[in-house]
UniProtKB/Swiss-Prot annotation:
Location of this chain's protein in the cell: Secreted
Name used for this protein in its record: Type VI secretion system spike protein VgrG1a
GO biological process, one term: protein secretion by the type VI secretion system
Main location: secreted
Originating species: Pseudomonas aeruginosa (strain ATCC 15692 / DSM 22644 / CIP 104116 / JCM 14847 / LMG 12228 / 1C / PRS 101 / PAO1)
Gene3D superfamilies per UniProt: 2.30.110.50, 4.10.220.110, Baseplate protein-like domains (3.55.50.10), Gp5 N-terminal domain (2.40.50.230)
Pfam (any one): Phage_GPD
Signal sequence, renumbered to the chain: none
Free-text function comment from the UniProt entry: Part of the H1 type VI secretion system (H1-T6SS) specialized secretion system, which delivers several virulence factors in both prokaryotic and eukaryotic cells during infection. Forms the spike at the tip of the elongating tube formed by haemolysin co-regulated protein 1/Hcp1. Allows the delivery of the Tse6 toxin to target cells where it exerts its toxicity.
Length: 643
């Protein structure tokens, strides 16, 4: 039934089940094609579900008997009112990348170029009908995020940024996506290297030709300047500029944008070039209408026979529209009356083609939380900038380890040149992540929060008046291993508490002052060493008591002066020496010896009495008993409480 027709249908339901009555199609470089098919069938009960998602193709007869194919996936089908003995159906054919508009994800790609990312997305979704015709190297992205967007939007915006576009090569059983970035990816189809222009009044219809021509030129910006910032080279100048000159009066209007999404100037130069080429690709467009069955988007051809000689040149087809109408099948008239017409949107083949960015870039509207991650067995994982890695709650693909994200900078209270504050978030902690310009590719940690697993250091709300900072020893620290500075603001019980888990070093480069309004209690578990470079003065308003459990030694290179207003009393066991304010000196003991290696003198201004057998007037009562001293010393060092 179709053999004599201009266009034939090949569908999953079998030969001649569906017949083409009319087709409208649109193709465009870097965009998805759509072919709207108006079909008829002798069967009014076709199962539409057996068409959806299945491949279907049309074959268009070309001059000389060869055929051109339009192949796609049935994205939509419907049954409509028929005509006579035929039921009516409609189907929309889309390319296989259209199926990427039906799936979305949140995932992270690291250390890959955009072509590598695109191919990975295709393969992960089970597609292999693509071809790489790219001509230049592409930079490696350290970090690239697909965030709450379809897989198609994700790869589309990346291609728009990198200056990549695509088109489709059709075969009978498949269509192939061709990744392109330059003239070399395109060819002229067989028999169509040159296509003539015939004015419609001449009526030449013996070969494919154009019969209508339009050319338009439009003012576009003449230059684009981009800028960005690299924190690893904060003083680097990253501003780049690209321009394309045009010979008209308004050709030099500049564009400026920030951020340019790069940290290397050569990448910025390429991005600026891509964008100005995309803009300037709109400067001149030629639209040709005719009967040219073999040419579509992505093809090259040379126009001939047009009255304006400068337009007889080589063109790249950047867009194509097709209209096919076939005679009603009820007439039985075969292919008579079938019509084909196309409109081609073209640019000069010497002009670079780029896509204007039109795919929405996802914006993270507000901060998120994430969990700090790192290698197994580590508690802190950071780099030389104090950056950490995190697992985002939306990322279902990572393994929550050191490969989960890029290194992310952490906001600190101060950040000076070799000075400031530093608290590195630790593995397992929950942090607040913001995004520069809302860009999911540019995260920055701005805070930290507690949760049911990472709980607060003080029992709440009972201790709501307490604030401070409490750390944890690492590696292998337990809740008993920490440093802490804590403030208690409860009225009447205010306190500043400082706990050092091991050592505490205080360095004062000038003066230090300590003032205690009431009591001060000082306890040292082992030794104390005090070095005083000049003088020391100590004043005690009332009593001063010193208890020494062992020996005490005082060494003085000069004068050792001891003064007492009432009495100096030295007691050792049963020996007592008293120095009284009235000048009386009393010495008492069970015996005494006076030794001199030289002469000895006793001078007295009054009488000198030497008595034997008399009782001592000075006793050893008081604190001179060793057992009493030992007891008092031990009382100052009670044993630690058990349990």
């Amino acid at each position: 039934m179709q053999l004599t027709r201009l266009v034939q249908v090949d569908c999953p339901l079998g030969p001649d089940v569906l017949l083409l009555q009319r087709m409208e199609g649109r193709e465009e470089l870097g965009r998805l094609f759509a072919y709207e098919l108006h079909l008829v069938s002798e069967n009014p009960n076709l199962p539409l579900e057996q068409l959806l998602g299945k491949p279907m193709s049309l074959s268009l007869e070309l001059p000389g008997g060869s055929r051109r194919f339009f192949h796609g996936i049935v994205a939509r089908c419907s049954q409509v009112a028929g005509h006579g003995q035929f039921a009516g159906y409609q189907a929309t054919l889309r390319p296989w990348p259209w199926l990427l508009t039906r799936t979305s994800d949140c995932r992270i790609f690291q250390n890959q170029s955009v072509p590598e990312i695109i191919k990975q997305v295709f393969r992960n979704l089970g597609f292999s009908d693509f071809e790489d015709a790219l001509t230049r190297p592409y930079r490696e992205w350290e970090y690239c995020v697909q965030y709450r967007e379809t897989s198609f939007d994700f790869i589309s915006r990346l291609m728009e940024q990198e200056g990549i576009y695509y088109w489709f090569r059709h075969e009978q059983k498949r269509h192939i996506l061709v990744l392109s970035d330059a003239y070399g990816a395109h060819r002229s189809p067989g028999g169509y290297a040159s296509v003539p222009y015939y004015p419609p009044t001449l009526g030449h219809r013996e070969r494919d030709h154009f019969f209508d021509w339009q050319m338009a030129r439009e003012v576009q910006p003449g230059s684009l300047t981009l800028n960005d910032y690299d924190f690893q080279r904060p003083g680097a100048r990253l501003e780049v500029r690209s321009n394309i000159a045009r010979p008209h009066a308004a050709a030099d209007y500049p564009l400026y944008d920030y951020p340019g999404e790069y940290v290397q100037s050569q990448d910025g130069e390429q991005y600026a070039r891509n964008r100005i080429e995309a803009i300037q690709a709109q400067h001149e467009r030629v639209r040709l209408r005719g009967v040219v069955r073999g040419i579509g988007a992505g093809h090259l051809f040379r126009l001939s026979g047009y009255p304006r000689d400068d337009q007889n040149r080589e063109y790249l087809v950047v867009g194509a529209e097709y209209r096919v109408v076939q005679e009603l099948y009820e007439t039985g008239s075969g292919g008579a009356g079938s019509q084909f017409e196309s409109e081609l949107d073209c640019i000069d083949a010497s002009q670079s083609f780029r896509l204007l960015p039109q795919t929405p870039v996802p914006v993270v509207r507000g901060p998120q939380t994430a969990v700090v991650v790192g290698p197994k067995g580590e508690e802190i994982w950071t780099d030389q900038y104090g950056r950490v890695k995190v697992h985002f709650h939306w990322d279902r693909h990572d393994q929550s380890n050191e490969n989960s994200s890029c290194w992310i900078r952490v906001s600190q209270a101060w950040a000076g040149k070799n000075w400031g504050s530093m608290q590195i978030p630790r593995i397992g902690q929950e942090v607040i992540v913001s995004f520069l310009e809302g860009d999911p590719d540019r995260p920055i940690i701005t805070g930290r929060v507690y949760n049911a697993e990472q709980t607060v250091p003080y029992e709440l709300p009972a201790n709501a008046t307490q604030s401070g900072m409490k750390s944890r020893s690492s590696k292998g620290g337990t809740p008993a291993n920490f440093n802490e500075i804590r403030m208690e603001d409860k009225k009447g019980a205010e306190q500043l508490y400082i706990h050092a888990e091991r050592n505490q070093d205080n360095l004062v480069e000038n003066d230090a002052s300590l003032s205690v309004g009431h009591d001060r209690n000082k306890s040292i578990g082992h030794d104390e060493l005090a070095r005083i470079g000049n003088n020391r003065t100590r004043a005690v308003k009332l009593n001063d008591t010193l208890l020494v459990g062992g020996a005490k030694s005082d060494s003085v290179t000069g004068t050792y002066l001891i003064e007492a207003g009432a009495q100096i009393r030295l007691v050792c066991g049963k020996s007592v020496v008293e120095f009284n304010a009235d000048g009386t000196i009393n010495i008492s003991g069970s015996a005494f010896n006076l030794y001199a290696s030289g002469n000895g003198n006793i001078d007295t201004g009054g009488r000198l009495d030497l008595n034997s057998g008399g009782a001592s007037e000075v006793d050893a009562k008081g604190k001179g008993v060793q057992g009493t001293i030992d007891g008092q010393v031990q009382a100052m060092f009670p044993p630690p409480a058990k349990g």
